UniProtKB/Swiss-Prot annotation:
The keyword DNA damage does not apply. In the N-terminal section; belongs to the methyltransferase superfamily. tRNA (mnm(5)s(2)U34)-methyltransferase family. One of its GO terms (molecular function) is flavin adenine dinucleotide binding. It is found in: Cytoplasm. GO terms for cellular component: cytoplasm. SUPFAM superfamilies: Nucleotide-binding domain (SSF51971). Residues 1-248 are annotated as: tRNA (mnm(5)s(2)U34)-methyltransferase. GO terms for biological process: methylation; tRNA wobble uridine modification. Transmembrane segments: none annotated. This is tRNA 5-methylaminomethyl-2-thiouridine biosynthesis bifunctional protein MnmC. It comes from Psychromonas ingrahamii (strain DSM 17664 / CCUG 51855 / 37). Pfam families: DAO (PF01266), Methyltransf_30 (PF05430). The gene is mnmC. Catalyzes the last two steps in the biosynthesis of 5-methylaminomethyl-2-thiouridine (mnm(5)s(2)U) at the wobble position (U34) in tRNA. Catalyzes the FAD-dependent demodification of cmnm(5)s(2)U34 to nm(5)s(2)U34, followed by the transfer of a methyl group from S-adenosyl-L-methionine to nm(5)s(2)U34, to form mnm(5)s(2)U34. Its main location: cytoplasm.
């Protein structure tokens, strides 16, 4: 049996009353009462946490709520409604953004969720985007964004006993408020326990509150033991009592002492005394575009510097790119990352397209069984037992029927996959960012060097931003308080990043004119290369992979190589033979890759300090805090799947900069940190040779 089996998510088993009230067959309990569900939820959770008054008095930009048990999403939807009303009535209040994290072990199927939410037409404005983005049953965090209302939902699928400890908690805490919901303690005793209460306590910010419908004595005592000051108040309607409380100052102090150092991330928050609203991003591809929009939506002023004469000039400049996840048999951290990032990217592209039209089609992707090695690899992916909505096997006949042309091979079908226009998407995202906030774009500006500003001494210059950076271009220099490099392989040109383990690979994509033989192709084909359906009378066929080759000149031989790969993998078909490559229509880009396929995202570590800091790492049991350059970040190493991963990676980095909950478990976060290979070597007692 595959190691992935224990990571699979099971759906809730629902049966319905005559009044369409959903009941859980597993827990023998009701999700909500159709007559009183809204009033009870508002009374227990919104009023119980005194959110109306707290939002009015709140001085920060974003407020974070966590919930045990997403269920039908009613608590989330009602909170959305309350928050939208609050923003409308208080447009000048500092609070602008709501972050809601919910933990669900047995998510409803989408059809069941649709039925359940039909009860609440007054919540349609929030139900519609929820249903549009509702994920398939995959383990981990699914980030859903309601841009119109400035609300983000992190929907964590899995046992909260596993998922909650996997969250990265800042030293200032993570959540302002907890909804302790779920089925009654008598029905679901496994969830309601002291371990959970302690984890909830450790996630709390200063002044965090908690509310729950139950008044069970062991719940009250468990929360008190975990560091909450608890009280009782009148329960809703006929219920005698319910519990409310807040985190104690003693618990906050004790929780800080329990925090362990991080090998891969700084455990301490950076200086927040001065808001770092001025961000410089270096780059011109999908990573820099997505990050620009993510930071704009958080109120930052962003300046984008691109060394080329246009955006999407490099690897992001192809006419078409395939979109599908990188999966494996174990459905390990890498597979989970790409699966959930893929689902987020789909939603992201559809949302961008609503205001900035982009050519794309989610008509599916086929991975072909073109030789024994590929067949073995694809069969292993199937053994993971992932949902058919994500990946399924097709017979030869089914493959031909769905492709629209003759292939005569089995395939793996990704029904949600497809293709998109990379250059159009990058340009659309940047236009959207300009429409939503303060983004300035500077082309033909190559960053040569940068260093920490020498005047960063608040005692000498109180008006100077703390830990800002001086950026030096060919004809001028400028200062920004925060710097992000989204510079692909050019990252290695900067002294602060010279030791980052990156590789470069040249790739040429052939643009081929359609004809009557190939035009019927309805779906993207992936083999050793790929072939897209026609867009504007043209297909994309690719791509070559020339490791360490930085030459960006057109190559006729690589046109031939792309066609040869297609004919080798799909032999004996007249339609492949009639593809015309006798022209210079192609795009050459340099991919930036990492050895383990994980990208690099996060704060940039100090390499020299790391060698000193971790010289005894092989003997230490507990890690110490890793040394990082202040206010300096990296987003690179996206490889050939940047359009699958970049939107969620940008969200993650913007969330980290803004001290919001992150959309990845620690296992995935650690795997994406820049210093991961350095630390692994040092922990094994091996020297770093750079």
């Amino acid at each position: 049996m595959s190691d992935a089996k224990y990571k699979l998510i099971k759906h809730a088993q629902i049966h319905w009353s005559d009044q369409l009230e959903p009941f859980s067959s597993l827990f023998d309990d009701i999700y909500f009462n159709t007559e009183q569900g809204i009033d009870e939820a508002n009374y227990v959770f919104f009023d119980g946490n005194k959110l109306g008054k707290r939002w009015l008095d709140y001085s920060a930009q974003h407020f974070s709520i966590a919930e045990t048990g997403f269920g039908t999403g009613l608590n989330f939807l009602l909170t959305c409604q309350k928050f939208a009303e609050f923003i409308k009535l208080n447009p000048n209040n500092p609070l602008k953004k709501l972050h809601f994290s919910s933990f669900e072990k047995y998510p409803l199927t989408k059809p069941d969720l649709i039925i359940a939410l039909q009860q609440w037409p007054q919540l349609t404005a929030f139900i519609t985007p929820l249903l549009a983005q509702y994920p398939i049953a995959l383990k981990g965090c699914h980030r859903l964004v309601l841009n119109e209302f400035n609300i983000t939902l992190d929907l964590w699928f899995g046992d909260i006993a596993d998922t909650l400890p996997s969250l990265h908690v800042y030293d200032c805490g993570l959540f302002d408020c907890w909804y302790l919901d779920g089925f009654a303690p008598s029905k679901n005793p496994e969830m309601w326990n002291d371990d959970l209460f302690q984890l909830i306590s450790q996630s709390c910010k200063k002044d965090a509150t908690i509310a729950t419908f139950t008044a069970a004595s062991f719940v009250r005592k468990g929360l008190i033991k975990a560091g909450f000051e608890m009280g009782k108040q009148k329960g809703y309607d006929k219920k005698r009592e319910m519990l409310i409380g807040h985190i104690s100052t003693e618990a906050l102090a004790a929780n800080k002492l329990k925090q362990h150092g991080q090998y891969y991330r700084p455990a301490k928050s950076e200086n927040t005394a001065q808001k770092k609203t001025d961000v410089a991003i270096i780059g011109g591809g999908i990573a820099s575009a997505c990050l620009s929009l993510a930071l704009i939506r958080r109120g930052y002023k962003v300046t984008l510097y691109c060394k080329e004469s246009s955006l999407a000039f490099g690897a992001s400049g192809n006419q078409q790119a395939a979109l599908y996840p990188l999966l494996n048999e174990q459905h390990d951290a890498l597979s989970q990352f790409f699966a959930n990032a893929f689902l987020y990217s789909r939603n992201y592209i559809k949302q961008i397209n609503q205001t900035q039209p982009v050519d794309y089609s989610f008509s599916g992707v086929l991975q072909l069984y073109y030789d024994p090695s590929a067949s073995k690899k694809l069969d292993k992916i199937l053994q993971a037992g992932l949902p058919q909505e994500l990946v399924e096997q097709l017979t030869e006949i089914e493959t031909d029927n769905i492709a629209g042309i003759s292939i005569a091979q089995k395939s793996l079908h990704y029904p949600l996959g497809g293709w998109l226009s990379p250059k159009q998407l990058v340009e659309a995202i940047v236009r959207q960012a300009k429409n939503e906030g303060d983004l300035s774009v500077h082309l033909n500006q190559e960053l040569l060097t940068f260093e920490q500003s020498p005047s960063d001494n608040p005692a000498l210059n109180p008006a100077q931003p703390i830990n800002s950076w001086d950026l030096h271009f060919a004809k001028h220099s400028i200062q920004h308080s925060l710097l992000v490099l989204a510079t692909a392989n050019n990252t290695l040109n900067f002294k602060q990043c010279e030791a980052v383990p990156l590789s470069a690979a040249r790739g040429q994509v052939t643009h081929i004119p359609t004809n009557h033989k190939i035009n019927p192709l309805q779906i993207t084909l992936c083999h050793e290369g790929y072939l897209t359906p026609a867009n504007n009378q043209q297909h994309c066929m690719g791509a070559t992979f020339k490791r360490h080759d930085l030459n960006q000149a057109f190559s006729q031989q690589e046109q031939v190589d792309n066609k040869d790969k297609l004919e080798k993998c799909i032999p004996g078909k007249t339609w492949t033979e009639q593809i015309d490559i006798n022209h210079p229509n192609a795009h050459v880009g340099i991919r930036c890759t990492t050895r383990d396929h994980f990208p690099y995202v996060g704060a940039i570590p100090d390499y020299q300090a790391t060698k000193i800091h971790y010289k005894n790492a092989a003997k230490e049991v507990n890690p110490v805090n890793a040394p990082f350059h202040p206010n300096l970040y990296l987003l690179t190493g996206l490889g050939s799947r940047g359009f699958c991963s970049a939107p969620l990676l940008a969200e993650m980095l913007a969330s980290q900069i803004n001290k919001e909950p992150l959309p990845f478990a620690k296992e995935i976060l650690n795997a994406m940190q820049i210093n991961r290979q350095w630390i692994n070597y040092l922990k094994k007692g091996k020297p770093l040779h750079y």
